[in-house]
């Protein structure tokens, strides 16, 4: 059968799908509004970590250009800023993860695709372009949610009930933060820091322009003491922004503050700051058009997760591969095709959404017990950490209080 695939959007989902189909000899065209050479001058897009399952897919596609022990990290440090005393413990990955600035990552993959003969069309897609695109391709994959593209796919509140952001984000790349080194006894790792009632911060060693930087991804609870960082202007007064941030880090995230060289601390460059919020959303996975044509959602168009658990990019890559396999095997692009795609990808994708949404809420008694148990049991914390690769396994353990207690008790583990 004819298989001409149109992919709207050049994020990780769209590019991993395009590169996968290219390997299978299937014609795929990527449509995007940003050329590779434009990325370097744009604002920070996100702070994304790729776990080992995603790096393995990059190896399969031949696009892992960052296979360097100087770039990867190996563990998560968990810090809870409790009033009486902080709680600090570590969980390790079986294989390392890494973070690369998407202003470097995405242009590199676009170049790979084009160098191998792939077609990328650079244009802004308007609402009235959609019917012609649907007619042009045998299957239209929508992996960008801009404008009418995202609105085509209805919200499924039974899978993600939120209608407003649960966190106010202040994300930046900084110099002057110690995140470990591959050359000493404290290898690079990510810190997951919690200030109860105020929010979380994820500290990520990240390869960016000029080498390794540190991403501070602040997930601030509306109404909390950190919340005003979402609107604090850096451009209006960089020194005031820096001092306000340092003061709040000292109060709410002291474990990270103590690793800051205050003489060197600051944004790596003015564009390395992103402020805003996202509404966690799961949408209908496809929409039908006249002429027996359909469009299928991929990545953030299908499921937008808060960045708290770092699942968005890893899920988009996973879903791209599952969709690519289904396209390769398809005999028709119809409702049955979509059922096959959804069956293949939804267990992991929906587990990531549900797990992340749960972690946005105050911890239950069972979750509090798990946190304490992980602080006492390195094997348990290692398992929790490795499951960042496999959110369906994590959700199997966290989906109810009964499951959490059973996980803790499984090997005779004892927790208060």
Regions found by a protein language model. Name each.
Residues 1-13:
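Beta1/beta-strand and adjacent pyrophosphate-binding region of the FAD-binding site
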Residues 7, 275-355:
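Conserved mid-domain beta->alpha element of the FAD-binding
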Residues 8-10, 19-43:
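Glycine-rich FAD pyrophosphate-binding loop
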Residues 34-80:
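N-terminal FAD cofactor-binding segment of flavoenzymes
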Residues 45-50, 92-108, 143, 149-150, ...:
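Short beta-strand to alpha-helix junction loop
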Residues 153-191:
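Central beta-strand plus flanking loop segment that forms part of the substrate or channel wall
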Residues 194-273:
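Conserved FAD/dinucleotide-binding core of flavoprotein oxidoreductases
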Residues 270, 309-310, 325-416:
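C-terminal helical "tail/cap" subdomain of flavin- and related membrane-associated enzymes
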